[in-house]
Amino acid sequence: VGCLTGQRVSDYKRINSKMIVTLTDGNKYIKLKQEKTGNIVYIPLDYRVAAILDKYNGTLPKVYDQKINDHIKEIGEALGWTEIVELDEQRGAMEYTAKKRFCDLLKTHTCRRSLATNMYKAGASLSSIMAITGHNSEQQLKTSLKLDESEKSMLAAKENYFTKLRIAK
């Protein structure tokens, strides 16, 4: 549900069928008031979220955040996302490089970033993504996007400036 709504765990755990509304475009949305910011967002209702809500009679099962994080890590491991990655960490004044399995770094907030990144890669504008995630500024949102340098360049190549130049193939 987190990867399909782009919400914080505190918000997507509260999603229920009473939040589903149909807007003037005829599509169904989840109308949600975010706990942290108080922002009201309208999230397009993905058929998979609808199926999950149907399965549980309109209310998601109650699960502790840590248990959700454990399941996300297990899924990452089952998918083979076990490569060792290095990250800079700090404890007090001491900085060091830690080595961890990629799957062990996955958590509920990864779901929120994944939706934002996937939407952006698919060509959604920052303002469209912000309307769903509830980020208050583009700068805030940009820190959530996980793109490597080649992905950033390929996205830039789709901008009007470059499409008018006709990039060599």
PLM segments and residue spans:
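Alpha-helix N-cap/helix-start motif at helix boundaries, enriched for small hydrophobics
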Residues: S10-I15, I129
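Short, polar N-cap/turn motifs at the start of nucleic acid-interacting alpha helices
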Residues: M19-G26, D104, K121-L145, A168
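Short, basic (Lys/Arg/His-rich) helix/loop patches that form interaction surfaces
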Residues: G58-K62, K73-A131
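Conserved tyrosine-mediated DNA breakage-rejoining catalytic core shared by Y-recombinases
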Residues: T5, R14-I52
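Short pre-functional
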Residues: V1-S10, T117-N118
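C-terminal secondary-structure termini that scaffold catalytic or DNA-interacting sites
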Residues: D70, W81, E159-K169
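Catalytic-site neighborhood detector that most strongly recognizes the C-terminal catalytic loop/helix
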Residues: Q34-G38, T133-K158
